[in-house]
Amino acid sequence: MAALMLQGTGSDVGKSVLVAGLCRALANRGLRVRPFKPQNMSNNAAVTIDGGEIGRAQALQALACRTPPHSDMNPVLLKPQADRTSQLIVHGRVRGTLGSGNFRAGRGALLPDVLESYGRLRRQCDIVIVEGAGSPAEINLRAGDIANMGFARAARVPVVLVGDIDRGGVIAAIVGTRTVIDAEDAAMIKGFVINKFRGDPALFDDGYRAIAERSGWPGLGVVPWLAAAARLPSEDAVILERRADAREGRRIVACPILPRIANFDDLDPLKQEPGVELLMVPPGQPIPAEAAIIVLPGSKATIADLAALRREGWDIDIKAHHRRGGLILGLCGGYQMLGTRIADPLGIEGAASEVEGLGLLDVTTELAPAKTLREVTGTAWNSPVAGYEMHMGATVGTDTARPFARIDGGGGEGAINAAGNVIGTYIHGLLASPALRSALLAKIGVAGNGRDHGADVDAALDDIAAELAIHIDIGALLRIAAHPV
């Protein structure tokens, strides 16, 4: 069994996309491939085939491998709830809540969990493609590390270092990494890849050679800016692009960017609809009055994010939109916010508390320790819907008598107000269902294009894989992967 780990000179250098692309390129060669990320920090999570949860980036990488996502692919997941507090997920299950200092001090104890998952994956496939987190150059975090060199050395997995040339300073980033890490860690690195290059790569030939000479590592490729990456689900950052008016007569779908926004890739299918403009509203900006739909997204800290929403004055914008008869869709945490009350008697999100909701749905929510994790199928608005639930607590009330969806093998799910313009649901991913998305857009006079979002993502993975096959020496990567360090 072979294995290869991609580590970066920093965060956001494109490791996740490169891992996904390599997974698809190798799967296209007929290899059995599995993705692996020892430790991830993200509030964007996916439900796994074994009933757990992992980072959505690893779920995308599993799709690239043409295999179902499994909790072993991301054994340690941190989901930030506050600036210094995160929910700890191990093997897909909640293990508790940790402060940042506690995690740094105790993360080394999670290495056996990480190696256990990695060992199971190894036995299932021909090659594992591993993604690091942050950078091995963060030597202040080296003690107890399980995300980068701590894992690589324990599992004897060779490393390729990825540098992002688009942000500038890639020569210093790679050579600087070689300078600050110790000799044993440096020996794990078997080459480097330049990512996100724009223009003629021949212009970087001198720089490419200089990196190889100064680092002692061979170059394994220069990857161009991958336009197809924009067609993949969002992972850790929302593009804060705001326009005052809809372009070319498009109707605006507005979504406020909450501090602990979660699973915001729920909205990605709207980006491919020519009749709408998806507007992510950043703090400090009002939700525009011309919005046709307001979406309240998921949240990892519903009560705190509701307070933040009120501080921004977005509650005023939302209620004004409601009075005008505008459509409002609440997803998961956003659904909870639309109710009359949210109670957290056990302090799931922090101190025990009870707060007033926006009062646009006659429902109440009580948070509880048990987490609902399941994939669902059903019907809504006479259209098939498929997605997943991932929440803690239950929502009850009069408006649940008008459910948003009927779940196969179950009852009603979600709630709709009497006027029919306020909708709440726990189903993530529902907008990827073409008929359901078209039914929603029909309510604002827009014809949906009926495109299959999943097929578009799959095609993007193939496009990225084809680019990597041209610009990276995949044969060299396979030779490196075949020899444990």
Curated annotation (Swiss-Prot):
PROSITE patterns named in the record:
GATASE_COBBQ
Alphabetic keyword roster:
Cobalamin biosynthesis, Glutamine amidotransferase
Cross-referenced SUPFAM superfamilies: Class I glutamine amidotransferase-like, P-loop containing nucleoside triphosphate hydrolases
Q: Which residues form the active site?
A: 332 (nucleophile), 428
Pathway, per record: Cofactor biosynthesis; adenosylcobalamin biosynthesis
Looking at the record's lineage, which domain of life comes first? Bacteria
GO terms assigned for molecular function: ABC-type vitamin B12 transporter activity; catalytic activity
> Which biological process terms from the Gene Ontology are attached to this UniProt entry?
cobalamin biosynthetic process
Where does the GATase cobBQ-type domain start and stop, copy by copy? 250-436
Q: Which family does it belong to?
A: Belongs to the CobB/CobQ family. CobQ subfamily.
What function is annotated for this protein?
A: Catalyzes amidations at positions B, D, E, and G on adenosylcobyrinic A,C-diamide. NH(2) groups are provided by glutamine, and one molecule of ATP is hydrogenolyzed for each amidation.
User: NCBIfam families, alphabetically?
Assistant: cobQ, PRK00784.1
Identification of the protein by name: Cobyric acid synthase
List the source organism: Sphingopyxis alaskensis (strain DSM 13593 / LMG 18877 / RB2256) (Sphingomonas alaskensis)
Gene expressing this chain: cobQ
